[in-house]
């Protein structure tokens, strides 16, 4: 489950929804680190108040915190609830890193690789001795973790998937058309084989944009409004084209460059949206989650497209582990 609240009351709303979700059988809660509410601070609140749920970050951009800051934060969160925290890392985007933070979005693959390598050194309690292409650290040391914290990596394209297969404990997918999932899973399998790791060595998680509703058009339009801008980003746009929607990706890129958001939304046809999002009746959404699980998705990170509390609870209740077991 992925709650996303912003503004006054965001922490209490997230906590209330998370405690309710834990009470109906959810095993994980995942927090996006995109601003407005600091995900790592919020994770501490949730770890302290929940009893058994994993609390994960999906994901934090590697440019906005140094490895030493990540290491200290991870140690703190791991101490609150040993064995229940998961750190997800990713590159972020040009818009986020350069636009929001004023930082250079340089060599994202190398930056993620070096961050993971240096962070693992620090979490093991070693004195840092690292000179990379982009990062360096000397003399930092903290006590080793008593219980390892898994590191997940966000990945869309083959090179980042390759890195996750080599260096991570899990992989976070996002916004992929269902029809592209076999290619993605084969890419992961082949990357693990090249890395000399077992097929089950990498936990495969994905964000799922969902809404249980009697009016699928409502969910589709929410998806277009919320995620249309994502596909104007070159990374997501090229991923959409790679997944088989070349014409739609080209139209979105052109419309986005012109600032024509109506065209962007229109290019996300019902076919495209239905291939990516999980929107519709309870039975339809449950079936989609079963299809994803059968294809190799182990950890669904459900995000409700609506911010209406009734929509959220209906969606999360219908797709809870208990309900999925009954419906199987």
What residue ranges belong to the model's regions?
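Active-site-adjacent structural elements that line small-molecule/cofactor binding pockets in enzymes
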Residues: 1-328
